[in-house]
Every structure is written in C-alpha cells, then in structure tokens.
Amino acid sequence: MSKVKIGIIGGSGFYKLDALKDPVEKSVTTPFGEPSDALVSGKIEGVDCVVLARHNRKHGIMPTNINYRANIWALKEEGCTHVIVSTACGSLQEAIAPGELVILDQFIDRTTKRAQTFYDGTCGQLPGICHLPVAEPFCSLTRDCLKKAAEASNIPVHPSGTCVTIEGPRFSSKAESFLFKSWGGHVINMTTVPEVI
C-alpha cells in the first residue's frame, strides 16, 4: 500500500493548525498560477500533511476569486494522496445545528463564474471535450474515516449531506434558502464547488 499524505484545505477561520508538528512553509506556482497561499507541510499524529488556507491567511480572497485549480494542483504536486477540506456552512435543515459536522456526499452547484475543470485545453492540458463523472463526488472511504474520527471524538456528526454551493459573496435570500431546502439541500456554502470537482 502506498504512503498516505493528506492535503488539508482550511476555510474561513481555519488558518493555523496547532496539531501540525514541525511546520515548513513553501511557496509554489502551478500551470494555473499561484495557489491561495503558501503550502505548510508537517505531521499530524505521525501522518504527513500539507495545509493550505483557501482564502489565504489574511482572509483576502473572495470565493469567486479563489484559484481552485492551482490549489488542487499544488497539493497533488506535493504528493498528497487525499484531500480533506473544511468550509463555513449555513444549515438549511432544522436537524443540523451550529457546530455539528456534516460529511458531504452530494452537491448542488449554483455557481456561475468559476473554472470547472482542468481539461479545457489550457496550461498544456489536452484540448477537446472531457466529460467527468460526478455521481459520487466525494470519496466514500475518506468520508467513512471522517465519520469514525468524529464519533471517536464525541463530535456531533451527520454522516451524509447535500451542499448547495452559491457564488457569493452575498448570502442567499430567504426565498432562495427555502428553494434550496425543497431541493434536498442540507447545508449551504460558497466554496465546495468547483473544489470537489
């Protein structure tokens, strides 16, 4: 079995990870430009990890302007085998209270201004049409590990959920939130898509 290296993308308020031991900062560039911030490598409980602040550590990049492709490319180039992300979300369901963890398994994309693929013929990628399957956009094995870790830590957890990702930076109107809830949305945020793709 190959060695696991975890990429961690932190969202709003998640800029420093105290659990990361022996941190080493590295600035990188990618064929898609610079990622949101420097990569910070270290170990958590003996596991190699690379942490990246999605909005940068100064919280200076709006959701629409995040270079999602550069972020993912940079983590892949650093050898990350898995990526775990944290996002600030709002609940669309009464059963999901603030502070509870929702392990996403589906998304509804309501963004309009973001590059959705690496395969658009730019940056040395193959030109032409490339249809990507996203019926199950989140890794079931990683989701199961997160569920077990949350339960072991006594963190209230919802083992599945559908996230509605909106363009931002504005929040949804009440009418939009009721619509998203009627579609089966559990939580709402501004960054899951296209990051998961």
Segments (PLM) and residue ranges:
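Short, flexible loop segments at the rims of nucleotide/cofactor-binding pockets, characterized by
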Residues: H59-T64, V164-E167, G184-G185
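Positions that flank functional sites
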Residues: G90-S91, T165, E195-V196
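A C-terminal functional module that forms or caps the active site or interfaces directly
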Residues: K174-I197
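Metabolite-binding pocket within alpha/beta catalytic cores that recognizes anionic/polar moieties
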Residues: M1-V134
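Conserved active-site and cofactor/substrate-binding residues in soluble primary-metabolism enzymes
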Residues: P63-A70, E78, P137, L141-C145, ...
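Glycine-rich anion-binding loop/nest that anchors nucleotide
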Residues: I9, T81-V85, G161, V187-E195
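Active-site rim beta-loop-alpha module in soluble metabolic enzymes
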Residues: A135-K181
